A protein has these predicted regions:
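N-terminal helical cap/lid subdomain that shapes the substrate entry/recognition surface
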Residues: 1-66, 73-74, 85-87, 99
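Residue-level detector of anion-binding/catalytic polar loops
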Residues: 7, 77, 154
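Asp-based, Mg2+/Mn2+-dependent phosphohydrolase catalytic module
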Residues: 11-12, 37, 69-72, 85-86, ...
Length: 191
C-alpha cells in the first residue's frame, strides 16, 4: 500500500487473512479479487516482497517449541503440511532451526492438489512411514479439518492460529479443539 501512496493498515487487519495467502492479503489491502486485471502482477510483486522479508521477525506461536521438544522426547514424529508453495516453505523452514526436527514438510505444490484435498496429508504420512489413521492433524482453518477427515486422520482444530472473528472452529467437525499448542500434549496423554 505504501508503495502506491496509500496509508498502511494495522497488522491485525491482515492476521485473519494469513491463511488465505496472497489472495486474502491483497483482498484486504486493496479490495482486489483474482478477477481484477492487475491482480496477477500485484500478486507476483507481493510474492517478491514476501520472499525478501519472510524470515525477518518470524516466530512460531508460543508453546510450539516446547510442544516439539515434548513430541521428540516421546519419540513421536511430526511434520508440517502447508498450502504455501515450496518457493516459500523451504527457505522459511530452513531459517527456523526448530523445523530441522520435522520428519516431513509438505508444501502446497508438493502434490497435484492443495488442502482441503487429502493428498498433501497423505503425502506427509507416507514420508513419515505412518498409516494415516495413526496420524493427528492439527489445523487453524476449516480446510485443514476437511483435509484431515478426508485423509482418515484424527483432527484437532487450533483456535490460536490465524483465524479471524468470523471463524468458528467448534463447527468444523474436528475430533478435538485446542486453545494452545500445549493442549495437544494433554490430548495425547488421554489417547
Amino acid at each position: 500500500r505504501t508503495d502506491r501512496g496509500m496509508p498502511s493498515l494495522p497488522a491485525d487487519r491482515y492476521r485473519p487473512m494469513a491463511g488465505a495467502g496472497a489472495r486474502g492479503m491483497l483482498g484486504e489491502a486493496f479490495g482486489m479479487t483474482p478477477e481484477h486485471p492487475d491482480y496477477e502482477a500485484l500478486r507476483e510483486e507481493f510474492f517478491v516482497n514476501y520472499e525478501t522479508r519472510m524470515t525477518h521477525l518470524t516466530t512460531v506461536f508460543d508453546g510450539v517449541g516446547h510442544l516439539i521438544v515434548q513430541l521428540l522426547q516421546r519419540q513421536l514424529m511430526w511434520g508440517v503440511v502447508t498450502n504455501k508453495s515450496a518457493r516459500f516453505t523451504e527457505p522459511l523452514t530452513f531459517a527456523m532451526p526448530l523445523f530441522a526436527t520435522a520428519g516431513a514438510v509438505v508444501s502446497g505444490d508438493s502434490t497435484p492438489h492443495a488442502k482441503p484435498h487429502p493428498a498433501p496429508l497423505l503425502e506427509a504420512a507416507s514420508r513419515l512411514g505412518l498409516n494415516p489413521d495413526h496420524c493427528i492433524y492439527v489445523g487453524d482453518d476449516h480446510r485443514d479439518i476437511v483435509a484431515g477427515l478426508a485423509a482418515g486422520m484424527g483432527t484437532v482444530a487450533a483456535t490460536y492460529g490465524y483465524l479471524g472473528d468470523r471463524a468458528d472452529p467448534l463447527q468444523w467437525g474436528a475430533h478435538a479443539v485446542i486453545n494452545s499448542p500445549l493442549d495437544l500434549l494433554q490430548l495425547l496423554e488421554k489417547a
